[in-house]
Amino acid sequence: MSNHKLIEAVTKSQLRTDLPTFRSGDTLRVHVRIVEGSRERIQVFEGVVIKRRGGGISETFTVRKISSGVGVERTFPLHTPKIEKIEVKRRGKVRRAKLYYLRSLRGKAARIQEIR
């Protein structure tokens, strides 16, 4: 078996199929498993997807939310076992793949139109 086929076989077994389809502009609730010492808990991070990048096992997505008036962005690997589940709350209507312009917008200007 060639190296390429071997790598492809290993990564295919690691890919997750239980996650919903989503794209930039969608509002997600990401349930992340957090380990603190011997305890484990689930933390929910809700925000707008501003980008998806990569493909295969190394695919990542970035979620942005406003917390206490401060913008917080968190990048997650898509196929990590640390993600318990992803819920799509709203489907956003955007015409860009990368929504970096949201970083400079404040308040109602930063809203994204919902797909009906």
UniProtKB/Swiss-Prot annotation:
Record has Ribosomal protein as a keyword: yes
PROSITE patterns attached to this UniProt entry: RIBOSOMAL_L19 (PS01015)
Gene3D superfamilies: 2.30.30.790
MF annotations from Gene Ontology: structural constituent of ribosome
SUPFAM superfamilies: Translation proteins SH3-like domain
Stated family: Belongs to the bacterial ribosomal protein bL19 family.
HAMAP family, per database record: Ribosomal_bL19
Purpose: This protein is located at the 30S-50S ribosomal subunit interface and may play a role in the structure and function of the aminoacyl-tRNA binding site.
Protein name per the record: Large ribosomal subunit protein bL19
Encoding gene (name): rplS
